[in-house]
Amino acid sequence: MKETYQNLNSEINLWGPDGSLQLEKDKEAARAYFLEHVNPNTVFFHSLKEKTDYLIDNGLWSRDVVLRYGFDEFKRLMQHAYSFKFRFPTYLGAFKFYSSYALRNEDGTRYLERFEDRVVLTALAFSEDLEHAEYVITEIIEGRFQPATPTFLNAGRANAGGPVSCFILRVEDNMESISRMVTDSLQLSKRGGGVGISLTNIREAGSPIKKFEGQASGVIPIMKMLEDAFSYANQLGQRQGAGAVYLNAHHPDIMRFLDTKRENADEKIRIKTLSLGVVVPDITFDLARENRDMYLFSPYDVERVYGKPFSDISVTEHYNDLVNDERIRKTKINARKFFQTLAEIQFESGYPYIMFEDTVNRANPAPNVGRIISSNLCSEIMQPQVASTFKENGEFAEEGQDISCNLGSLNIAKMQQLANQDEFSHSVRVAYKFLNRVAKVTEMESSPSVVKGNNLARAIGLGQMNLHGWLISEGIPYDSEEAQERFRAYMHDVTYFLIGASIDQVQIDGRFGNYSGSRWEDGSLIDALAEESKKVNLEYSRVRSPFTEDLVDHWNGLKWEVKNDGMANQHLQAIPPTGSISYINNSTASIHPVTAPIEIRKEGKVGRVYYPAYGLTSENISEVKTAYEIGPEAIIDMYAVASPWVDQGLSLTLFFRDTATTRDINRAQVRAHKSGVKSIYYIRLVQKALTGTQVDECVSCML
């Protein structure tokens, strides 16, 4: 039998007697959910002191976090949080929080936290000081900033998982490196992060081992091993571990790699739960355009001849040399056939992700560290890595640099409601300081190369969500020039104030360890942003000063500050595919369009739940186009607007109608590459029969 709140929620999908949408029913559903479910199932305490003592003494809250500033200040922060009288505006937002985030008793039947409690513990765990903690509480409760799921879920809990969303490991062509990578993957997955891994350096199937020909097994057995490992590391049974493997398009195993995702693949090679990504250089597109063959190069021979791993070489730059070098074994396939196969697999499964290698490396803020060779589980984290070396006993000879990135997103609609430049800058800085604090205090001793990379880069990933919700509320079509102009100005402003915050943080934390030789130091990165600022419509920008005539002057001033002071962080932005946290925040996901004005979700035993898009009214619902109606071209163009401002990547999902063909997917791939977009995440087809495209997405990065 359905509860009252479920009935009320379902009524929002029905027209009322007066012919209008009954959107107010969703607020009634949220209220009924509290009265009928949350309140009766919440443990009652007579005082905050009683509650705090109970949760600390029973090993549920961390004493160090809760009492970081003393109990009196903890109480004051709690009073501050509850003073907002926060109410979830949607039933799904309330349901998501209490089903997935709120702390419960041991048998899971009763709640021990409310939303405000979780917010306060999050602020306490990752604030710079008491004043910043208060600011963080305000930003989260008023909906302008929301930390990612691992951070928000685990903050302040005793014996909980880690706060970091994403990790990326590189693996070299030796057993010691492979063994270490599997161990690290298990440990990082256990702590709640999604793990991306580059397999490009692994020698291909049939290559020699110790000069014995035909002995190597290639990448697929490693993929099978990783799939089992991530299934095993299921984070205390809460959710299955998650990983993604990336392979360069010019690796000899590339076609077998793609075949593992075919619906009719042999069970011996079929990969069911591991995500796949392909790293595609510029040269691959050039060869396809000219309808030429593309050569695949043996990583074993490349490393033997060049003295460095295959992934550390630009295939585009060295392609002709590699082709003409007789010492390097190679095979060839038709380049168009490769892209056709890529589209076929994406049509069937939604995979693989695509990372445009040369686009990404042209935007690399720290080429002095190394090349960017792969991405993460959601294709938005992109940082350079350094290989580790090992002794024969498996111990590190020298630790390299691997990647971690903590995430949080700004709500574009709420940010645009701020009255002036000072308020806008303040919100950006509060979010920045929070994420910077996560980077500083996170402990990952189980993976020394990740620790070293984090300490030297201090990378963060500030993201964005609710773009379409904001446009709906403003009456601006997603696929319009005005939408692009306004969004360009918004991303410009966020980037400008975010860089300023990192400059100021140098006074506290010093420059990030890899600063010397970076594009921050030589000024080329700021120069590129200054040039991009010429496209910004001044009418929409919040960057104002009576002393400068245009935005380029502002960027020149910022360049001077970086030159004098430096930067505290190697990376600042990444736009993830926000999921659960978008519902809690009453946002549309990430920066792509909605899939329906009123989204229908299936939530376990509860069944269907209805979620209206932010800004939706009876008057404008007929004007709201879905992602499938808008199509891939306009979505790619919007992501291209954001890409120059984001120093990492953006999770770009492409949506196609049921009439789409593999040729349409290929056209979208070419458009994305030409537009300067850095990666493609999932391919989604509207037809119901292709259930394989409705994949379980990355819980870690989906905020």
Residue ranges of each PLM-predicted region?
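Terminal amphipathic helices with adjacent charged low-complexity linkers/tails
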Residues: 95, 280, 360-383, 387-392, ...
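Polar, glycine-rich mid-to-C-terminal structural blocks
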Residues: 259, 268, 272-349, 357
